[in-house]
Amino acid sequence: MKTLLLTLVVVTIVCLDLGYTLTCLNCPEVFCKKFQTCRNGEKICFKKFDERKLFGKRYRRGCAATCPEAKPREIVQCCSTDRCNR
């Protein structure tokens, strides 16, 4: 009986969702390899860049609670899965 109870406790702990933390890219380069673990409440990954520049685009990537607004001539892309803001 104790073995069954212990097994049920272990299975319950393993199956519990102990919280999910989103991971987003966070760097200004086109080919970004730096990751950031988002803070509690940040459920969005974003990527911003200036649409006017063909070469040397400066990207801004990171985590956010909501999708940031685009400024004039700026493109913003948002998503909500791990490392989706490539």
From Swiss-Prot:
Any one GO CC term of the record: extracellular region
Single annotated GO MF: acetylcholine receptor inhibitor activity
Tissue specificity remark: Expressed by the venom gland.
Compartmental location: Secreted
Disulfide bonds: C24-C45, C27-C32, C38-C63, C67-C78, C79-C84
Pfam family, any one: Toxin_cobra-type
InterPro entries: Snake_3FTx (IPR003571), Snake_toxin-like_sf (IPR045860), Snake_toxin_con_site (IPR018354), Toxin_cobra-type (IPR054131)
Key words, A-Z: Acetylcholine receptor inhibiting toxin, Disulfide bond, Ion channel impairing toxin, Neurotoxin, Postsynaptic neurotoxin, Secreted, Signal, Toxin
Signal peptide as annotated in the record: 1-21
Primary residence: secreted
Record function comment: Binds with low affinity to muscular (alpha-1-beta-1-delta-epsilon/CHRNA1-CHRNB1-CHRND-CHRNE) and very low affinity to neuronal (alpha-7/CHRNA7) nicotinic acetylcholine receptor (nAChR).
Record-given protein name: Weak neurotoxin 10
Biological source species: Naja sputatrix (Malayan spitting cobra)
